């Protein structure tokens, strides 16, 4: 299976870049095929998804790029191919896909910046090629090993350097001479490279003695102090390598002999030191330093450094003094420094490749002081140095910003303290250097035990203030709290704020056995029956508690799918390509003919949307949608809807703002800026939605999907667009992400954010996916959320180039959509995911499951199939018919009284349920109490055409006098009830889900309870009849040809789930299935041959007395004087009310205490500055 990991050289995923790929490619010529040169090429190929460049690289050696850091291993296998950084096939592959051409055994002879051309020695593969024109030239020529040219005998036979494969091969050939066996081999230089060379001489196994000569008092003098060096010295000597310290070579003494051609030849005989001592030897390897290879640039007139090791002078962008010529790696001199470690060279390559490919989407990166931390195993000794490891000797080079500001303010001097640990028995030495207050780690060194290296280096890089004493770092003591232990919430934690249900309230009935299912728990405690936002946590507590009691907890979607979770159903629907609820019920349901319920319907609708992306109002899917999706707007407290056009990344033009203002003013809509940086218009009547959206769509706006379990917004700060601190183009990236994922539906809502720097103004760290710009790209954080149980995001990937952001997020979102449970946010999903973030990284970044290509392709298919739902609805007459308050009249009726608040109209407050908020009258008993009933025609039966084939049937809201009624046709049967849900006295039952309990066996329409016999005369005129008992009803004289009548109570009788808080009412008995205190009135209903639907109703005035809208609608004053009345009174008494533009003043503690006393202190909790006054 093809590896689609992002470590591959290229990605086929679309880039957010708007640039065209038809422009001619620019040529980049790279001089030098070493580790830094190939690092640049790899990064450029990876980032250049638009294929803007062709690359030509030349290398002097006959080998492709190999690992110079691992040169010592060459002596064990002597196969250079084992050191190759990429196999030869890699070069062939990218010749085809990325226009990479490489020439080996080819030297750069001269450079002409004026003509932008490079003269080269003819490559063996292309002898006619002598000149390479370039658009950009990258000099990665590296360095050469220093030889002491002033030392006599430095050029004798037997003198080597330790730099490349050719040096090692020469050393191997030399050591095969029989004269060498048993002799002494010498390494001059006790640094990193010198100790590596010493190991190489040992591995040759021909020298009787290997000696290292170091002019300082200890080895590794550039990495460790004297005490640490002495410990290394002890370890090296223990392995059989002799070390002479404080020795300087005066002369290499030679034997002068003649070869077969009688040509004089000098051969190493020994070393004379400056102190007069002599050491006989046959072989010398100099490892005394390096010199930058800058001759090509120097001869071309490009500025080079004159001191130190030379080097081609570069600026922070790594450009030389010549236009379009750059230098990276050991040949580059940055701020007077050259770097002989691979790390800084790779960082240079990274910066340059990023700027060539990503700078048009992001702030160009600059090269900064590199991290010179090293961790090596030299001759069996573990050695590491990190950060400012000589800060105690030379003074600190850099201080944490916070400390630097404090010292600047106080005029103090930077002081450091070193903490040292030495264990002579285990040969362990550690020295960590801290600021004088012990709050910051600046650097350190480790010998013998380097296990803490990975943990400590980030503390230095990030300047993180320590939360443990320095001694705990150096001793490796366990930080208090490292053991996470039990992360369960305390028992008194409030889980459901709507009904003030604590964790203990949920656990107790489960442990007592009173509740054995999630539905029982909701009915018993009322948790999750309010806003529903606590349900993920309620479910989690239920599952944990039941598991602790030894009860098996099945993660099935609902009773209709007892064997399958949402993820299971996703796979079944995907593989079998199911597209309707009946199809799914037949394939996976407990009852093939079931209508489903309020749990499985929206979950299956979400799966359909994630797979097939059909319109939510299409006939097959409309009945599966919750009320918000059903009318493409969030239903509000009073039954009206909110209107939220998309404002990608919060960026909006003045023209669109004006249109929004005009629409809000025309339809008297309450307006508010949302937390997602867009404008919400509240109070839109269902019958006005089409007209409102027509104006918005005509102005170039589209649905913001604020109503859907889908991508909501991608919030952004202004980033580099305006902010002087901006590092990345957060607005541009957020716009691209929101435009890409708009309309994407999932198990729950999805929110994103992009911040332009670490100040994090967009709060990307608590989003389902968030980006924070860094100098190298973006850090990608995932699986955070606010809500009932807030959770900070976790880091998925660091420093991701902009072109790789989208493939990663594509994979993450699709994997979440495929595997999450119903109504499970990404935070809870990750918590429940086996293996957690480490496993997710393997799946998303390393393609552990081999599905990354599939995830990207599926996301692209959804992106390509996007359409604006509101624009489609405006062009579909059938959809438009659904936007009516009443099916039998164009009249409107307000569902709740309104009041003016801060200049805008809003619905009055709901009273508390225990103070009249719920209508707990015996509505179901009205069937026995009507003085008389007559069959009344209410609506043409054609309105319900096609209902029998739909998962929710077809419903209608009917106005009769002042009373609102609801009528359904479901699987050939009619049902009627009051429109009002008594829980909150809202008028919306006709817009709810219809559900049935699953039968033990498959049901058909014939298995439903039979219709009552027909006795009333078939007539359009009212016919009176006496009241009937709940178990008997007046029957019509003749039934319609469809035999379609009221369905009495039975095992498969349907219920209606209120769209507000999911109270479920039987459409036959009127009883509430999940709240025994509530009920609704139901009515007999039938279709007759005259094409009308009839409901058996009492007289209008009697109907209105019991069910009239004016009687039950929530009115002003019912909720009391308001939650903030006391606060308003306080402000009024302080003279604050109504003032604008005032300067803040803080009341004195004594004055506040006199006026409001203890009550104010309890309400506010005191001020953050120590006073009890209010702080806003």
Swiss-Prot record:
Cofactor(s) demanded: siroheme; [4Fe-4S] cluster; FAD; [2Fe-2S] cluster
> Which pathway?
Nitrogen metabolism; nitrate reduction (assimilation)
Cite the binding residues for [2Fe-2S] cluster 1: 496, 498, 531, 534
Instruction: Give one GO term, molecular function aspect.
Output: 4 iron, 4 sulfur cluster binding
Q: Where is the composition biased (Low complexity)?
A: 10-23, 998-1008, 1030-1049
Please share the entry's free-text remark on the cofactor: Binds 1 siroheme per subunit.
Q: Which GO terms describe its biological process?
A: nitrate assimilation
Q: Where does siroheme bind?
A: 761
| Entry's transmembrane regions | none
Q: Where is the composition biased (Basic and acidic residues)?
A: 1124-1139
For this protein, the record's Pfam families field holds:
Fer2_BFD, NIR_SIR, NIR_SIR_ferr, Pyr_redox_2, Rieske
Keywords assigned by UniProt, alphabetized: 2Fe-2S, 4Fe-4S, FAD, Flavoprotein, Heme, Iron, Iron-sulfur, Metal-binding, NADP, Nitrate assimilation, Oxidoreductase
User: Start and end of every Rieske domain?
Assistant: 942-1094
Q: Where is this region: Disordered?
A: 1-23, 998-1051, 1124-1157
Question: Which annotated residues bind NAD(+)?
Answer: 183-215
Name the NCBIfam families on file: nitri_red_nirB, PRK14989.1
User: Mind telling me which PANTHER family this protein's record contains?
Assistant: NITRITE REDUCTASE (NADH) LARGE SUBUNIT
Please give the subunit comment from the record.
Answer: Homodimer.
Which protein, by its recorded name, is this?
Nitrite reductase [NAD(P)H]
Query: Which species expresses this protein natively?
Result: Neurospora crassa (strain ATCC 24698 / 74-OR23-1A / CBS 708.71 / DSM 1257 / FGSC 987)
């Amino acid at each position: 299976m093809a590896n689609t990991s992002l470590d591959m050289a290229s990605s086929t995923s679309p880039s957010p870049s708007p640039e065209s790929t038809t422009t001619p490619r620019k040529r980049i010529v790279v001089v030098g095929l070493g580790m830094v040169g190939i690092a640049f090429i790899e990064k450029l190929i990876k980032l250049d998804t638009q294929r803007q460049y062709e690359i030509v690289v030349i290398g002097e050696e006959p080998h492709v790029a190999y690992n110079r850091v691992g040169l010592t291993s060459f002596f064990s296998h002597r196969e250079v191919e084992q050191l190759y950084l990429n196999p030869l096939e890699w070069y062939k592959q990218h010749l085809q896909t990325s226009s990479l051409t490489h020439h080996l055994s080819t030297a750069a002879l001269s450079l002409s910046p004026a003509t932008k051309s490079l003269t080269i020695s003819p490559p063996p593969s292309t002898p006619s090629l002598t000149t390479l024109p370039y658009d950009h030239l990258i000099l990665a020529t590296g360095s050469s090993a220093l030889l002491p040219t002033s030392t006599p005998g430095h050029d004798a036979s037997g003198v080597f350097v330790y730099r490349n494969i050719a040096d090692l091969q020469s050393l191997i050939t030399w050591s095969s001479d029989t004269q060498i066996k048993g002799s002494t081999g010498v390494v001059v230089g006790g640094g990193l490279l010198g100790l590596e060379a010493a190991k190489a001489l040992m591995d040759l196994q021909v020298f009787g003695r290997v000696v290292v000569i170091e002019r300082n008092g200890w080895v590794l003098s550039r990495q460790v102090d004297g005490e640490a060096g002495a410990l290394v010295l002890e370890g090296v000597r223990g392995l059989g390598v002799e070390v002479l310290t404080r020795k300087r070579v005066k002369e290499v003494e030679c034997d002068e002999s003649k070869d077969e051609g009688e040509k004089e030849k000098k051969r190493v005989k020994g070393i004379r030191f400056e102190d007069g001592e002599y050491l006989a030897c046959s072989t010398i390897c100099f490892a005394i330093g390096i010199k930058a290879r800058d001759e090509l640039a120097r001869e071309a007139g490009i500025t080079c450094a004159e001191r130190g090791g030379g080097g081609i002078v570069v600026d922070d962008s790594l450009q030389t003094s010549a236009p379009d010529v750059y230098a990276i790696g050991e040949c580059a001199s940055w701020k007077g420094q050259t770097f002989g470690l691979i790390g800084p060279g790779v960082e240079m390559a990274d910066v340059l490749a990023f700027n060539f490919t990503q700078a048009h989407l992001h702030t160009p990166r600059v090269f900064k002081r590199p991290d010179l931390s090293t961790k090596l195993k030299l001759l069996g000794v573990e050695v590491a140095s990190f950060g400012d490891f000589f800060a105690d000797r030379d003074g600190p080079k850099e201080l944490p910003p916070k400390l630097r500001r404090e010292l600047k303010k106080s005029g103090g001097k930077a002081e450091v303290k070193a903490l040292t640990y030495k264990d002579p028995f285990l040969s362990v030495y550690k020295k960590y250097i801290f600021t004088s207050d012990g709050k910051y780690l600046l650097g350190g060194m480790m010998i013998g035990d380097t296990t803490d290296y990975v943990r400590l280096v980030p503390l230095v890089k990030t300047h993180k203030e320590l939360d443990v004493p320095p001694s705990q770092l150096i001793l490796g003591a366990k930080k208090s709290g490292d053991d996470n232990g039990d992360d369960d919430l305390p028992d008194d934690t409030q889980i459901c704020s709507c009904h003030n249900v604590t964790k203990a309230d949920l656990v107790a009935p489960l442990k007592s056995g009173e509740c054995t299912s999630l539905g029982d728990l909701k009915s018993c405690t009322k948790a999750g029956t309010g806003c529903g936002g606590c349900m993920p946590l309620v479910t989690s507590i239920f599952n944990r508690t039941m598991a602790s009691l030894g009860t098996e907890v099945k993660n099935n979607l609902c009773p209709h799918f007892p064997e399958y979770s949402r993820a299971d159903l996703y796979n079944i629907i995907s593989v079998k390509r199911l597209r309707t609820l009946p199809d799914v019920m037949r394939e996976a349901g407990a009852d093939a003919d079931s209508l489903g319920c309020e749990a499985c319907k929206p979950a299956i609708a979400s799966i359909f949307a994630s797979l097939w992306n059909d319109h939510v109002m299409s006939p097959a899917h409309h009945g599966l949608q919750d009320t918000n999706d059903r009318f493409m707007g969030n239903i509000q407290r009073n039954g009206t809807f909110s209107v939220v056009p998309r404002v990608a990344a919060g960026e909006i033009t003045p023209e669109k703002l004006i249109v929004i203002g005009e629409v809000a003013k025309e339809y008297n809509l309450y307006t508010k800026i949302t937390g997602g940086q867009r404008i919400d218009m509240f109070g839109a009547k269902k019958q006005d939605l089409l007209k409102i959206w027509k104006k918005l769509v005509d102005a170039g706006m589209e649905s913001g999907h604020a109503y859907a379990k889908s991508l909501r917004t991608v919030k952004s700060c202004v980033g580099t667009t305006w902010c002087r601190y901006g590092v990345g183009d957060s607005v541009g990236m957020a716009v691209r992400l929101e435009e890409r994922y708009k309309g994407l539906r999932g198990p729950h809502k999805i929110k994103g954010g992009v911040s332009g720097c670490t100040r994090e103004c967009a709060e990307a760290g608590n989003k389902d996916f968030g980006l924070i710009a860094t100098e190298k790209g973006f850090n990608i954080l995932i699986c955070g959320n606010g809500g009932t149980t807030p959770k900070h995001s976790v880091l998925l990937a660091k420093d991701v180039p902009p072109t790789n952001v989208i493939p990663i997020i594509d994979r993450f979102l699709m994997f979440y959509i495929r595997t999450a449970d119903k109504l499970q946010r990404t935070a809870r999903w990750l918590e429940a995911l086996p293996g957690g973030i480490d496993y997710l990284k393997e799946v998303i970044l390393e393609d552990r499951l081999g599905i990354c290509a599939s995830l990207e392709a599926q996301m692209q298919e959804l992106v390509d199939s996007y359409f604006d739902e509101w624009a489609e609805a405006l062009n579909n007459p059938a959809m438009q018919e659904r936007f009516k308050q009443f099916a039998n009249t164009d009249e409107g009726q307000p569902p709740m009284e309104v009041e003016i608040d801060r200049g805008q109209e809003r619905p009055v407050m709901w009273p508390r349920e225990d103070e009249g908020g719920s209508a707990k009258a015996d509505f179901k008993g009205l069937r026995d109490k009507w003085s008389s009933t007559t069959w009344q025609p209410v609506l043409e039966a054609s309105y319900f055409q096609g209902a029998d084939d739909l998962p929710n049937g077809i419903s209608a809201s009917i106005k009769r006098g002042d009373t609102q009624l609801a009528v359904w046709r479901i699987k050939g049967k009619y049902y009627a009830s009051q429109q009002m849900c008594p829980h909150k006295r809202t008028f919306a039952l006709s817009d709810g889900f219809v559900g049935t309990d699953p039968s033990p066996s498959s049901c058909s329409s014939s298995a439903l309870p039979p219709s009552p016999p027909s006795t009333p005369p078939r007539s359009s005129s009212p016919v009176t009849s006496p009241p009937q008992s709940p178990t008997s009803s007046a029957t019509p004289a003749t039934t319609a040809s469809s035999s379609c009548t009221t369905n009495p109570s039975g095992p498969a009788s349907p219920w209606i789930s209120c769209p507000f808080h999911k109270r479920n009412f039987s459409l036959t008995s009127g009883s509430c299935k999940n709240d025994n205190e509530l009920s609704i009135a139901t009515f007999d209903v039938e279709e007759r041959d005259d094409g009308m639907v009839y409901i058996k109703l009492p007289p209008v005035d009697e109907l209105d007395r019991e069910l009239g809208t004016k009687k039950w609608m929530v009115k002003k004053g019912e909720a009391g004087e308001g939650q903030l009345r006391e606060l308003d009174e306080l402000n009024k008494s302080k003279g604050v009310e109504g003032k604008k533009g005032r300067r803040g003043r803080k009341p004195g503690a004594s004055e506040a205490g006199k006026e409001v006393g203890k009550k104010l202190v309890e309400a506010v909790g005191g001020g953050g500055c120590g006073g009890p006054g209010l702080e806003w």
